[in-house]
C-alpha cells in the first residue's frame, strides 16, 4: 500500500492503520496502539510529536507491534529481549 505524503496526525494515522484493527492513542511524550477492545498492543512509542515520523513509518510500527503482540501471546517462551 502506498501513502501519499500527508502530515502525520492522529486522524491520518488512524485512517492508515484501520485495516489492522488498531488505532493510535497519544500520551504525554509517547503514543501507543490499541485494538478495538481498547487493549494496548505492543510497547509505547516515545515521540514528542506524531509528525516526527511519516504515516508509512507509523503503519510499519503498528504492523511490527501487532506481530510482536501475537508472537508473545502464542509463543511467550520464544521472546528474548
Set out the residue ranges of the language-model regions.
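Negatively charged, low-complexity tracts enriched in Asp/Glu with abundant Ser/Thr
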Residues: 1-21, 53
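Small/flexible residues
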Residues: 6-7, 28, 80
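Polybasic, low-complexity nucleic-acid-binding and compaction segments
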Residues: 11-16, 27, 42-49
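Short linear loop/turn motifs
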Residues: 27-36
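Detector for the mature cores of small, proteolytically processed
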Residues: 35-81
Amino acid at each position: 500500500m502506498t501513502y501519499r505524503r500527508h502530515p502525520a496526525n492522529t486522524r491520518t494515522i488512524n485512517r492508515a492503520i484501520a485495516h489492522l484493527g488498531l488505532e493510535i492513542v497519544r500520551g504525554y511524550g509517547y503514543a501507543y496502539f490499541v485494538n478495538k477492545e481498547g487493549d494496548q498492543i505492543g510497547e509505547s512509542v516515545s515521540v514528542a510529536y506524531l509528525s516526527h515520523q511519516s504515516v508509512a513509518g507509523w503503519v510499519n510500527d503498528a504492523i511490527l507491534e501487532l506481530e510482536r503482540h501475537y508472537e508473545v501471546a502464542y509463543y511467550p517462551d520464544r521472546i528474548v529481549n
